[in-house]
Amino acid sequence: LIQTNAETVNRLLKIGVLSKPGLSYIICLSHEDVLNSPIERDKKAVQLIKVGLMQYLIKIQKEAINENSIAATVARTFIKSNVNDEIVIYSFNYTSFGAIAPNSSFAMEFNDAVKYVHGLCLDGNIILGTRDENIDKNYDFIQKSFDSQYNPPAMVYDLMDADDITIFGHSLGINDSQYFKAFFERQSSSTNPQKKNITIFTKDAKSEIEIKRSLQEMTNWNLTSLYGLNNLQIIKTDECVNNPTLLRKYIKMYVDNEEDIDSIIHI
């Protein structure tokens, strides 16, 4: 085996075009690939990364989830919610909700409600790449929308149509901005304003700043208007651990009964 493409792959990983969370795979191409053009070798390298990522995720998704986590608490809130029948969940993960939480208290509840934006590793059809950009046409293959299996659900429409939106653990970074920009742009405009409840869960103060920077760009630097025209809150999960009141306030937006709220927080 000849490692002909390591430099290119490492460059793509470094600039965020590709990602390999927790992977330590070595990208190796067969001898005949030396005769191929650099573009063809890059295509094959991307496919190798995709296969390696799917293998890794299939392995780790068998691990049990923490039922006491903030994410699990939010999921239980949706189950007890007075708008349960109207919930739609969009997952940007490649792992199946049912597979990672087969024995959880909420896995079956959401089985039909979850839509996978970038495919599922169990189906072997994950979408890996960048957002739409004006790049060298020979490298169109690294853009998500050029993948022959790319067929995302109507998330943008549902965001526009929803009254309550909860975003959990997503950085709202540039690579997925095409799914969010139109929504946040509209919600920060005073033209025909429609007030919505928007809650964003993130880890800590550092990630909160990064999210606000992304929101600034997506609202054309009208973040103040986004706050003023909506009920927008950013909840830091690290703070929820020591201050359950923050989480209780969120749960009360959707659940009225105090006993139900207690059961959601304390399983």
Where are the regions a protein language model picked out?
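Extended, H/D-rich, highly charged conserved domains that either
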Residues: 1-161
